[in-house]
Amino acid sequence: MNPLIWALLITKHLPPSIITMTSHHWLLAWLGLELNTLSILPIIMKTHHPRATEAATKYFIIQTFAAALILFASTINAWQTGHWSITASSTTQTTTIMTIALMLKLGAAPAHLWYPEILQGVTMNTALAITTWQKIAPTTLLLLLHNHLPTTLLVLMGLTSALIGGFTGLSQTQTRKIMAFSSIAHTGWLLMTLMLAPHLTTLTLITYILMTIATFTSLSTTTMKTITDTNTTWTNSPTLLTLTMLSLMSLGGLPPLTGFMPKLLVLNDLVIKNLTPVAVTLALASLPSLFFYIRLAYLTMLTNPPNNTNTKYNWRFKPLPHQTTTTTMTLTLLLLPTTPLLYLTT
């Protein structure tokens, strides 16, 4: 692809989300969501592979259907209330439809079946964009609507996402599918923060984005597409592979890594508000994710000695981590000591 066209596609990918995040009118928000979908489709299809074409088609259908639901609900709401403002009062029916549509855009369970398949059909960098930047605009709309969201629906979808993201990831061997189910599990925690403490939603989202960027850039640098690829990655760059495993455990929420910070704050708020059963369920739901991360780290670092392998892989290649990997990896591993400061400011 022509570098100028590629630069244009990347640049065009940024304004739609900004339009949605800064809008107070439902039509502008819907326009930003649609442009956001259309801007990433050429990036998905860049590899000219049948899997990429299939992923782009699925992504277009799902996102367009969700945007149509949002437009339908906002039109009905404007007809009944006489305004198009996002933060103003809405009817229960339209708010429920909007919530379901935004859950579909986020890939939250039970509307999650499209999410792992699409990530499996794209490149690592495209999967990174789908799991991070594409989540910002729908999350912003949910944050603007948090006073009107149906609490029961949010709790059910949050717990379901955390459970399905953890237990379904146990049987996966593809790293992109593992990251997909990790994203679904983190979406469940994000929904719980929307219901309980909206001021923690931004912190949870930023922490998730930092950990995901660090993990995806590390996987892309080491060219790890399956768990079996770790057998040769260890001989390439032991340090980078160790940091990758630590970032995966941070995604699982293992203390004393950064991923434990938002989970600690969410569980603390749940206990303070006398929702101990929900807190226990969320904590137990995070254990399967942590289990397959630790299992992956154990199989990689403790059972594979650093010896030369007689395989077709280019094991003599020594990948150099990108500057983005170094920065985000540092934040992924070392931000937990700032938790007391967050207690003082929230």
What residue spans do the PLM features occupy?
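Core, highly hydrophobic multi-pass alpha-helical transmembrane subunits of bioenergetic inner membranes
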Residues: 1-346
